[in-house]
Every structure is written in C-alpha cells, then in structure tokens.
Amino acid sequence: MESILFIAIAFLINSFISYKITNMQPKIKSRIFKRVKMHYLNLIEGKKAEFDKKAMPILFGFMIIALISFNILLYVVYNCPVSITSIIAEILIIISMIIIWKAFNKEISVYLCDDGIYYSNKFISWKNIENVKKDDGFIVLFGKKKKILGRKLYLLQRIYLKYDEEIENIIKNQIEKFRDKA
C-alpha cells in the first residue's frame, strides 16, 4: 500500500510544477503590440473549453466521492482496516486535483509582440504559424506540423485568441512580414 503513497506524492509534485508553469510570466524580448487577457483553457481549446470549465469541478467532485466511497466500502463490506498511508495518499491526490484545477482555471495575459506570441512560459514565433482562421468568436492560429519520432505522426499546435479586428490585423500583418523575410 506504500506504493500508492509514492504515486500520490509524484502526482502532487507534478501538480505543483503545472501550477508553477502556468503562473510564470513570459520574458518578452521585443516590442508589445497588444496584451490580451484570456482564460487559459480557452487559449488551448477555444469554444470547447466552456464545457470543460463547467464539467471539470463536477468530475473532480465525483472522483473524490468515489475515492472516499471505495474506502468506506472496503471497511464495511470486507472488514479491511484502512491504513493511514492510504488515507494520506487520498488526501494528497485530492489536494493535487485542486491544485491542477486552480492552475488551469484562470485568466492569463497573452502578448502579441514584434517577434511572436508570448504567454505563460511559452513563445510562438510568427514564422511558425502556418494558417489563421476565424472560428466561433475566436481567432485560431495553426502552427506548422512537426514530425514525432521521425514517423508519419504529426503534432499540430494551435492556439485560440478572442476575436477582435485589431488582433486579427496585427496577426495577419506580422505573419506577412515574416513570410516576406523568408
């Protein structure tokens, strides 16, 4: 049963790292055109994040209730005493889920700069953006396809920004500027 405690500690460390990464401020190296405040989940998923923002706390609640119910079931049905390590592991897992939810359920600043887009600890250069599309009140920026492990699998990066004409004009002008340089 001690192995579950190690897993819970690893999960807790992972959630702290995720929280720390999402709270990092970017080190901007060029002129800022526009700063956009945006929800982190919307930046990653666009309109689909609206469902996630509502469903995630409910899902975490069900998982916590299931975890506690499982221990009660073990104790009542099988007369199996619940060890202190399993209780500590459950508490650490619950704390980890709360930390992860706090990390992803917040607004962050996205900076449209002269050389690319900065947010959290990430930087996306204008030359790495392949396509721009308007979709459901968002501007979708598609990154260039990257091969994974030299195979036929590709990783397609995309981010979503709130639709605004000024933002759209900045993005299109910068992409054209970087395409002309190449």
From Swiss-Prot:
Report the domain of life of the source organism. Archaea
| UniProt entry tagged with the keyword Protein biosynthesis | no
Keyword Kinase carried by entry: no
Record localization: Cell membrane
Listed InterPro entries? DUF986
Q: Name one GO cellular component term.
A: plasma membrane
How is this protein named in the record?
Answer: Uncharacterized protein MJ0696
The organism is Methanocaldococcus jannaschii (strain ATCC 43067 / DSM 2661 / JAL-1 / JCM 10045 / NBRC 100440)
